[in-house]
Amino acid sequence: MEENFIEVEGLRVRYFEEGSGPAVLLLHGASLGSSADVWTGNLSDLAARGLRVIAYDQPGFGLSDNPEDLSVAYRTRFVLAFMDAVRLQKARLIGHSQSGRIAVRLALEHGERVPGVVVLATGSLLPPLPGRGKPDAAEGEEGAAAEPTLEDTRRLLEENVFDKSLITPAVLRTRLRMSTGKNFRAFLERSRARGGEKKESKRESKPLWQRLGEVQSPLRLIYGRQDRGHAAERAALAMRLHRGLDLHLVDRCKHLVQWDAAEEFAALSGSFLAEKT
């Protein structure tokens, strides 16, 4: 696995890369402390399946620069800019949590550049349960009002991981590093900007979960059975509403699917993206 930096739209961006073959971009979520580091335990397994795997720190996360625009819309456009910078005309996308929305939107609007999508634990791509309202307003943006301590970071990870033994001292140190300083400032700015994004989303004629059938690229969704927001119940509802939807539930697995179910994730994603797209 190589760690590199590249300039994209005037921002210095860190990324990891491993393997050769069809290109796959791994897009991390938006909770405090998220970065490309959430994928480092998965790159080798995916690369071994004949894929060129790239995971980058999105703007405002990890070791990448903070942009002026911290909106989800900007980070969606930035995926294409990053692809251009690393000279990828096409790339399969794996989006975790909030970034599953990014991946699906790009497949809808730029399908010629996105020949396949895997969604991990994106609650907003599941229908709400009747009478429960909308549960994903701040999807994947969990954090803290004050810069977190090591114990704050541990608690946040424990909410998202079924197997607590995965939260090693090294993992905690990295997560805390990615949760403080310029990344915490970016988190606060994203929180303040969220109101404007809600107004914009209300203008859309249909939520993305109702548009999954419009995605022309091969699409697979993977959720942890023990994830928050009644994910298992809503996944079952999604499969009833969308006939033929390629959706998988993994047991003993919470929100960080790529950690709790690393082998299942690699098998389900690697074979799907290498063979069917």
Question: What role is predicted for each listed range?
Answer:
Residues 148-213:
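Conserved alpha/beta-hydrolase catalytic His-Asp/Glu region
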Residues 11-63:
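Conserved HGGG/HGGXW glycine-rich cap/lid loop of the alpha/beta-hydrolase fold
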Residues 104, 108, 115-155:
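Flexible "cap/lid" loop of the alpha/beta hydrolase fold
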Residues 215, 221-223:
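Short beta-strand/loop motif that positions the catalytic acidic residue
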Residues 95, 99, 103:
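Gly/Ala-rich beta-loop-alpha elbow adjacent to hydrolase catalytic centers
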Residues 40, 48, 55-94, 109, ...:
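Active-site loop/oxyanion-hole signature of alpha/beta-hydrolase fold enzymes
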Residues 243-277:
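Catalytic active-site module of serine/aspartate enzymes centered on a nucleophile-bearing elbow/loop
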Residues 226-230:
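Acidic catalytic loop of the alpha/beta-hydrolase fold
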